[in-house]
Amino acid sequence: MNHKEILDQLVPIVIEQTPRGERAYDIYSRLLQDRIVLLGSPIDDHVANLIVAQLLFLESQDPDKDIYLYINSPGGSVTAGLAIYDTMQYIKPDVVTICMGQAASMGAILLAAGAPGKRYALPHSRIMIHQPLGGIQGQATDIIIHAEEIKRIKEMLIDILAKHTGQPKDKIANDIERDYFMSPYEAKDYGLIDKVIEKRE
């Protein structure tokens, strides 16, 4: 049994009473009814497709009502993360972002990409930004091509962070040279979030 199969067996089932009797949901489907989307894993193409599908579904249900994206992710694939990012910017509803645990790498970019004034973190979470990572093998010409692509992606991510934080691009470029960890309060000062929340208001 692989890791995913084990996790699938551990997903709680919620039983609800309806006029037609009992109805069982997995916990994620039940949260989706309340417009809550959970990003709680490394970001790969499969995870990104699930998140994007949920965002598009919730927009079709009600284009004027906020969507709540809870993030606890170490980051992952840049292209997969950018698929989520672009969808967040594309859809009509505001996407409220809430960091719990950690939002690192692409997770931090998605956190910052929430609707202005609606980006939050819980008090013991952590946020980390850094430059994109690349492990390339192959012929010298291919390595050069991939190195140029990594530089292009790095500039794109700097532009995105500058847009959502208000920080100068040269400061961001310097800060992401190495892993740059922040407490929620430091992330607020940096412009990655708008507020640290301890209790639901």
Curated annotation (Swiss-Prot):
Q: Can you tell which superkingdom this protein's organism belongs to?
A: Bacteria
Residues annotated as the enzyme's active site: S105, H130
According to its UniProt record, which reaction does this protein catalyse? Hydrolysis of proteins to small peptides in the presence of ATP and magnesium. alpha-casein is the usual test substrate. In the absence of ATP, only oligopeptides shorter than five residues are hydrolyzed (such as succinyl-Leu-Tyr-|-NHMec, and Leu-Tyr-Leu-|-Tyr-Trp, in which cleavage of the -Tyr-|-Leu- and -Tyr-|-Trp bonds also occurs)
Q: Where, per UniProt, does this protein localize?
A: Cytoplasm
Please name the Gene3D superfamilies in this protein's record. 2-enoyl-CoA Hydratase, Chain A, domain 1
SUPFAM superfamilies of this UniProt entry?
ClpP/crotonase
The identity of this protein, by name, is: ATP-dependent Clp protease proteolytic subunit
